[in-house]
Amino acid sequence: MQNITQSWFVQGMIKATTDAWLKGWDERNGGNLTLRLDDADIAPYHDNFHAQPRYIPLSQPMPLLANTPFIVTGSGKFFRNVQLDPAANLGVVKVDSDGAGYHILWGLTNEAVPTSELPAHFLSHCERIKATNGKDRVIMHCHATNLIALTYVLENDTAVFTRQLWEGSTECLVVFPDGVGILPWMVPGTDEIGQATAQEMQKHSLVLWPFHGVFGSGPTLDETFGLIDTAEKSAQVLVKVYSMGGMKQTISREELIALGQRFGVTPLASALAL
């Protein structure tokens, strides 16, 4: 019998959650991570599945995700503990045939349930599937320190925030030319914040929750982690720059245009226009 804890997707989740903890992005039970799988990914591990998988209804149907398996982090679980006990802190779930709920096939032992942000994740998965023709498979939420700090001092506007991050590090425009969506402050763990996040995910692979954290989307765990890491590095640079009295010089609009042309990306027009 093959052991599911040695699968690429469980090992990938262990690495991503451990790396995020070491970065300082996921204190206590902060943060959550979901990865969309295929049936072929989980097929070799049926012998590891629960004999009687628990069924949990969704707060709203998501037919686009019907019959789709995911691996998810658990509610109230600490990222730092995933590496110690994957089965207690992670779960493989599969949405049912009408998208109305899901079964917990593996993991989430002792009656644990998926992250409370699952509505935001699933709604965002739906939008990123449509926006990327199915390429994006990962949604990651974390409390990236410097990005959060900037939401207290910058105007919480997509164009303004995006332009500042682009100027904070040359690679940013190349990595997220679509910019950073920003929500107003909202109560977490609700359908409302999930819907608002998903709406921004139609246009942006990064979405900021002011005074709280960031959502990122990508095709792989590495790409999604790298996306957030890149934005966070720029935010760290900006925090240092602002603390030293602000910018004396920066990357110009013309230079940003040239950067986009060199790497074949189309920068967010509203951010470029500032």
Swiss-Prot record:
Keyword Transmembrane helix carried by entry: no
InterPro entries, sorted: Aldolase_class_II_sugar_metab (IPR050197), Aldolase_II/adducin_N (IPR001303), Aldolase_II/adducin_N_sf (IPR036409), Rhamnulose-1-P_Aldolase (IPR013447)
Cofactor binding, note field: Binds 1 zinc ion per subunit.
GO biological process, alphabetically ordered: pentose catabolic process; rhamnose catabolic process
EC class name: lyase
Subcellular locations according to the entry: Cytoplasm
Purpose: Catalyzes the reversible cleavage of L-rhamnulose-1-phosphate to dihydroxyacetone phosphate (DHAP) and L-lactaldehyde.
Record's protein name: Rhamnulose-1-phosphate aldolase
Species of the source: Escherichia coli (strain SMS-3-5 / SECEC)
